[in-house]
């Protein structure tokens, strides 16, 4: 998919306005669907949003970034907090927030021997140092299956 051409098509179809700058894929984006750069007008998009969520959701992400783009160049409020932005986003049916990834990001699972409270962590914890926050019972690491 030629990203800049796709963004130009979405801009004309959904906004009735041309997109005059470039759009790029940015693999370094982790928690966001895209970014608008007011300094030079280009847009960055997260390729995983297209892979994980499909073209329908990705089109809504493109609309979101184009709201920033068009409002900025019209001299209107282009930030998330601005009424102009919220109104235009609702008008074109863009996404306000990016859908969360279905992939689990927790690597370590612990449970309390006494009360059964479950803890999920990205980083390993020292079981001789930490105890359950509920009952101060001993924690054990659960096996991943």
From Swiss-Prot:
* GO CC terms in record: cytoplasm
Q: What SMART domains does the record point to? A: SprT
Alphabetically sorted, this entry's keywords are: Cytoplasm, Metal-binding, Zinc
Q: Which cofactor does it need?
A: Zn(2+)
Textual note on the cofactor: Binds 1 zinc ion.
Q: Where is the SprT-like domain?
A: 4-140
* Name of protein: Protein SprT-like
Task: Tell me what organism the protein belongs to.
Answer: Streptococcus pyogenes serotype M18 (strain MGAS8232)
Lineage of the organism:
Bacteria, Bacillati, Bacillota, Bacilli, Lactobacillales
């Amino acid at each position: 998919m030629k990203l800049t051409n796709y963004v130009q098509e979405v801009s004309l179809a959904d906004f009735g306005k041309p997109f005059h700058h470039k759009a790029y894929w940015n693999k370094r984006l982790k928690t966001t669907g895209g970014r608008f750069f007011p300094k030079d007008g280009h847009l960055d998009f997260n390729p995983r949003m297209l892979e994980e969520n499909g073209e329908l959701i990705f089109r809504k992400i493109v609309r979101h970034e184009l709201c920033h783009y068009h409002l900025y160049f019209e001299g209107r409020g282009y930030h998330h907090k601005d009424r102009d932005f919220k109104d235009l986003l609702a008008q074109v049916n863009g996404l306000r927030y990016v859908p969360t990834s279905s992939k689990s990001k927790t690597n370590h699972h612990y449970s309390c021997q006494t009360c059964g409270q479950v803890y999920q962590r990205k980083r390993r914890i020292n079981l001789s140092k930490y105890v359950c926050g509920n009952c101060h019972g001993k924690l054990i690491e659960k096996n991943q299956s």
